[in-house]
Curated annotation (Swiss-Prot):
Cytoplasmic topological domain: 1-15
PANTHER family, per database record: EXOSTOSIN HEPARAN SULFATE GLYCOSYLTRANSFERASE -RELATED, GLUCURONOSYLTRANSFERASE OS01G0926600-RELATED
Entry protein name: Probable glucuronosyltransferase GUT1
UniProt-annotated glycosylation sites, renumbered to this chain: 144, 405
Subcellular location per the Swiss-Prot or TrEMBL entry: Golgi apparatus membrane
Organism the protein comes from: Oryza sativa subsp. japonica
Length: 417
């Protein structure tokens, strides 16, 4: 970035004089929460009766003891791995007879070793995962007959089963070799990326449902903000010039629209953040270091049309959620034209997107509540697994056949856990 930037901590000016069409849009959009929407039948599927899952009983050092050591794991955005375990333990989908199971689940919490600042330390995650798989392969016959092809694992970290927070090193490491036949349930989703393999199930990051629901405003509240965003534009500690972080997309948002009265954008995170999103028509969801973030969840739940700025993103539950119908996609290179793009969308298109977002079943797909509720994120994962059935012939190995190489990996990853 050649121009010297104004501090991104300053808030863009609130709307002063808006075009008449925009004011009409606000007037029209205030009552769409109750509008009927079409095209969301698949997210209402009930997976019960369509598959059976066997949950391995592991020593508590792989799961319960880790949470007992640091309860912060229950509220960070990687907590899906914990709550998926709890969901399955009490679900009608669970079977106690492994011989009748369609899928096998290994409850290992690989993102629960946290720094004092709450960031996961994943240096030991590959060793922990390898140890858990060795355990199930020793005491049960089911892993060995498929080498994991009928097993699924929840790996919700930044770059999933690559187990590293920096992309370059995550790509260099690649997906943990012993997981290459398994189905991975992960938040990271980017096309043609070393950390997303074919057949993976992309899910939303964990956002506490009770926290979100505590901030709901009346559905008739007018949407008086045109474009809303709170978050970093520059990661000055890791990328001072702003050209690499978010591939420059966030920096471009700030430099082009910091003085635009239709854009309410800032790095400040107010206490009214959730309420503000419910007063906005569009919520920006740009990539950061990875394509995904909790903003996507928040935008959908709060009925704010997600503006997705992440060229190669693979969105959560994309086989069921009609993302093209509820979101707006803007190419990273087109960010300088963002104002023109958004103001050019016909009012009827915006109202249709808002009507679909207002559907309770749409909001439910983004959440992992406790206890589980019909149509929530847990059920969407189970539906995605059910759609993969029946397993193909290539899932089961011939007697004596081996595919995975247990000696493959870095020297550090091969150490005992």
């Amino acid at each position: 970035m050649g121009t010297r930037r104004r501090s991104a901590r300053a808030r863009a000016r609130p709307p002063l004089a808006m075009p008449l069409a925009v004011l009409l849009l606000f007037a029209c959009s205030s009552g769409v929460a109750a509008a009927a929407a079409q095209g969301i039948e698949r997210i209402k599927d009930d997976p019960v009766g369509k598959l059976k899952v066997y949950v391995y009983e592991l020593p508590p050092k792989y799961n319960k003891n880790i949470v007992a050591k640091d309860s912060r794991c229950l509220s960070h955005m990687f907590a899906t791995e914990i709550f998926m375990h709890r969901f399955l333990l009490s679900s009608a989908i669970r079977t106690s007879n492994p011989d009748e199971a369609d899928w096998f689940y290994t409850p290992v919490y690989t993102t629960c070793d946290l720094t004092p600042w709450g960031h996961p330390l994943t240096t030991k995650s590959p060793r922990m995962m390898r140890s858990a798989i060795k355990f199930i392969s020793k005491y049960w016959p089911y892993w060995n007959r498929t080498e994991g092809a009928d097993h699924f694992f929840v790996v919700p970290h930044d770059f999933a089963a690559c187990f590293y927070f920096q992309e370059a090193k995550a790509i260099e490491r690649g997906i943990l070799p012993v997981l290459r036949r398994a189905t991975l349930v992960q938040t990271f989703g980017q096309k043609n990326h070393a950390c997303l393999k074919d057949g993976s199930i992309t899910v939303p990051p964990y956002t506490p449902a009770h926290k979100i629901r505590a901030h709901l405003v009346p559905p008739e509240t007018p949407r008086s903000i045109f474009v809303y965003f709170r978050g970093l534009f520059y990661d000055t500690s890791n990328d001072p010039e702003g050209g690499y972080y978010a591939r420059g997309a966030r920096a471009s948002v700030w430099e082009n629209f910091k003085n635009n009265p239709m854009f309410d954008i800032s790095t400040d995170h107010p206490q009214t953040y959730y309420e503000d999103m419910q007063r906005a028509v569009f919520c920006l969801c740009p990539l950061g270091w990875a394509p995904w973030s909790p903003r996507l969840v928040e935008a959908v739940v709060f009925g704010c049309i997600p503006v997705i700025i992440a060229d190669d993103i693979v969105l959560p539950f994309s086989d069921a959620i009609p993302w093209e119908e509820i979101a707006v996609f803007v190419a990273e290179d087109d960010v300088p034209q963002l104002d023109t793009i958004l103001t050019s969308i016909p009012t009827e298109v915006i109202l249709r997107k808002q009507a679909m977002l207002a559907e309770p079943s749409m909001k439910q797909t983004m959440l992992f509540p406790q206890p589980a509720e019909p149509g929530d994120g847990f059920h969407q994962v189970m539906n995605a697994l059910a759609r993969k059935l029946p397993h193909g012939r290539d899932v089961f190995l011939k007697p004596g056949q081996k595919v995975l190489n247990w000696t493959e990996g870095t020297r550090e990853d091969l150490k005992p856990w």
